[in-house]
Amino acid sequence: MILGLGMDVVEVARIERILAGPPARVDRFLERCFTARERAYCDAARDRATRYAARFAAKEAASKALGAPAGIRFTDVEVVRGAGAPVLELAGVAATAAARLGVRRVLVTLTHDGGVAAATVVLDGEEAR
């Protein structure tokens, strides 16, 4: 049963502008929004801004799917590489909200084209009673 659905779109140029900013501001943004694993994955790529944009979109989409729970942090939602497909790992407030909803599986898809990155998140499970 689908318990939640979220979608978000991010302009890659917006992330490029942030990454081109003063180093202290860039570091604050990256540490606030992305886990160490996400930063390592994105920083290893030529298309760094595109990878960050897709992951940012996934975090926003997950928050929407969860009902935008109070206190959720960007790092509560982590995009990791699965066996050929991205996987979302939830922690903190995101994990608590998912458990409360009865979520058993989190599905995510990422895409990018034409200067935008997008993500869709589907929460699957049995409705909590």
From Swiss-Prot:
It catalyses: apo-[ACP] + CoA = holo-[ACP] + adenosine 3',5'-bisphosphate + H(+). It is found in: Cytoplasm. Transfers the 4'-phosphopantetheine moiety from coenzyme A to a Ser of acyl-carrier-protein. It comes from the Bacteria. It comes from Anaeromyxobacter sp. (strain Fw109-5). GO terms for molecular function: holo-[acyl-carrier-protein] synthase activity; magnesium ion binding. Mg(2+) binds at residues 8, 60. Keywords: Cytoplasm, Fatty acid biosynthesis, Fatty acid metabolism, Lipid biosynthesis, Lipid metabolism, Magnesium, Metal-binding, Transferase. Its EC number is 2.7.8.7. HAMAP family: AcpS. The keyword Magnesium applies. It holds the Pfam family ACPS. GO terms for cellular component: cytoplasm. The gene is acpS. This is Holo-[acyl-carrier-protein] synthase. Belongs to the P-Pant transferase superfamily. AcpS family. Its cofactor is Mg(2+). InterPro entries: 4-PPantetheinyl_Trfase_dom, 4-PPantetheinyl_Trfase_dom_sf, ACPS, Ppantetheine-prot_Trfase_dom. GO terms for biological process: fatty acid biosynthetic process.
